[in-house]
A protein has these predicted regions:
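Electropositive, gly/pro-rich neighborhoods at or near active sites that engage anionic ligands
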Residues: 1-129
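Conserved mixed alpha/beta catalytic, RNA-binding, or beta-rich assembly cores of soluble enzyme
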Residues: 96-98, 112, 127, 140, ...
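Short, well-ordered alpha-helix to beta-strand connector turns
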Residues: 129, 186-187, 214-216
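Redox- and metal-dependent alpha/beta enzyme cores, enriched for Fe-S-associated oxidoreductases
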Residues: 144-202
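A short, acidic, amphipathic alpha-helical segment used as a generic capping/interface helix at domain edges
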Residues: 201-216
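Short, glycine-rich nucleotide/cofactor-binding loops
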Residues: 131-143
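Short, basic, glycine/proline-bearing loop/turn elements
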Residues: 106-108, 133-135, 191-198
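A general structural motif
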Residues: 129-131, 157
Length: 216
């Protein structure tokens, strides 16, 4: 029965002309929105990955003490926090719904180097900034974002604003979820204002308030 339902979902997801190469003016977020609407229809709600997101956050929270300890013991706590924030992206449920970020995999953060070449420049700019806007992404990963923001707090007195989703889409964290995870203790939480389940962040579709903040 589950296999039959999955086939039915996939048939409907792949049925639009846009999924068959009939339209080339659409972006990946546009296609995701079409597929997401099908999943929501079959699930009977607008957040079919809610339980999975909660599980990803739980797994990340279990790792948080280990990560904080590694960050605090590092010779460069800011750089270490950046590494873990990048590694946390491996919690993306769209890649793997069964496993989370294991402690062993978290330790791989220490091996990141080439992708962190600009961390020193980033740190300098953060120290000079008066306002920092931090766009969140996936559930689970957001816990490591919080640890990075905690480090930002230690090196900068800038106003720190965290932007999360207004509406659920895939496994991205919503503003209400970010609040429940305690991110409001380290940053002001704002909704992105996008009134459709659009993956990614299209600035032109965010609220005027967010657009004005980015352009300041």
């Amino acid at each position: 029965q589950d296999v039959d339902q999955l086939r039915a979902i996939m048939r409907k997801v792949l049925s639009p002309t846009s999924m068959k190469g009939g339209r080339w003016d659409l972006t990946a977020p546009d296609l995701v929105e079409e597929a997401w609407s099908v999943l929501c229809e079959f699930a009977g709600n607008n957040d079919p990955l809610k339980d999975i997101k909660a599980d990803q956050n739980r797994k990340a929270l279990e790792l948080a003490p280990y990560v904080r300890k590694a960050v605090m013991q590092s010779n460069n706590s800011f750089l270490e926090a950046v590494k873990f924030a990048i590694t946390g992206n491996q919690l993306d449920v769209m890649l793997d719904t069964k496993t989370g970020l294991k402690k062993e995999r978290a330790s791989e953060a220490a091996m990141l180097d080439a992708s962190i070449n600009n961390a020193n420049e980033l740190e300098k700019r953060i120290k000079k900034a008066h306002k920092i806007i931090y766009f969140t992404d996936n559930s689970g990963e957001v816990i490591f974002d919080r640890i990075l923001m905690e480090q930002i707090r230690t090196i900068s007195s800038a106003e720190l604003i965290l932007v999360a989703r207004t509406l659920p889409i895939l496994n991205d964290v919503t503003a209400s979820e970010a609040q429940s995870l305690g991110l409001g203790y380290v940053a002001k939480i704002m909704e992105n204002g996008i009134q459709e389940p659009l993956a990614g962040t299209t600035l032109s579709k965010t609220s005027k308030e967010i657009q004005d903040l980015v352009r300041e």
